[in-house]
Each structure stands twice: as C-alpha cells, then as structure tokens.
Amino acid sequence: AILIPLYRAICLSFLGNYAPAAEQGSFDFAYTLAQLVTTIQAGFSTYWGPYVYAHYRTEQERIGRIHDLLNLLIFGFFCLLVMFEDIIFIIFPAKSACLPYFPLMMLAVVFSILCEGTVYGNTIARKPFQDTIGTAVGVAANIAVCAVLVPRFGVMGAAVGLVAANATMF
C-alpha cells in the first residue's frame, strides 16, 4: 500500500522542480483516474487473498487458473480503457492534456495489480523480503528514470518513471 503514494510522490517531486503547476495537476488527475481501476481489484482482493491463503495447498491448480484468468481480464480491461480513453476525456474536456500519457498511467496500474499475485506467493513461500527488495529496486528505477527524463520531457518523463517503477517491482 505504501508503493502507490511513494511512487506518485517521487514523480511529483521531480515535476515540482521542472514543470509548471498545471502540468503537475494534470499528472495527478491522470494518476488518480488510473487508480480508480484498483477499486475493483481491491474489492476482489477482499475475497481472493483469504481464499488463496486458506487453500494454497489443496487448490493450487485452481488458484493458478483463476490467477491467469484475472491477469487476462486485467489486461483486457486495460486495452478497453486505452481504446475508449477519448470518451473519458470528452467527459472531462478540461483534463484532455493528460491524454498523451494516460495509457502509461494505466500500464503502471496494471503492473501494480499484477504484482499483488506475486505478493501472495512470496508470503506463502515465507519470502516477503523479496517484496521489500522489489519495492526498493522500483524506487531506485523511479528516481533514476525521473532524474533523466523529467527535465527533458516533463510529465511524459514522469509517467515513464511511474511505469518503470511498477514494472521493475513486478
């Protein structure tokens, strides 16, 4: 849970030094809009997490199939949102400045959601330190990418930094 505000804060810190306030607000809006997808995932996780922990020894094949199906559904939902993103920005015309990098924000969310399955597996295998290492490497990737790209590309560089952080963590 700490990753979401941490990665966001790193991007916004770099944007604070290199981008005007309007671009920072545009980035924050796109990020918040992309995060709405996680509310669906959070509702499902309320059921899925306890089920995985209770049945991982006896239902491994079923858990694996459901996990694969969920990954496919998440990726499909991502594709649909990207395909119909114009409709979102017809509803919010004042926020259309985030249209070029909104797909990157969605991709970062997809990596974050997919990472949750790995977290369950690491906990069951009693290797949660791997999650900590993944988080630390994700933070390092976020800082490095933002340091290189934000001064030159502004908000687009921050969006790439966000994707890099979540992809590295995954």
Feature annotation, model-predicted:
Residues 129, 136-170:
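Membrane-interface helix-loop junctions in multi-pass transport and translocation proteins
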Residues 54, 107-137:
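Membrane-interface junctions at transmembrane-helix termini in multi-pass inner-membrane proteins
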Residues 1-50, 108, 112-116:
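Transmembrane helical elements of multi-pass membrane transporters/channels
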Residues 28-31, 70, 102-105, 109, ...:
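Residue-level recognition of transmembrane alpha-helices
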Residues 40-44, 64-112, 143-152:
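Alpha-helical transmembrane segments of multi-pass membrane transport and lipid-handling proteins
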Residues 30, 34-60, 64-71, 119-124:
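Helix-loop junctions and terminal segments of transmembrane helices
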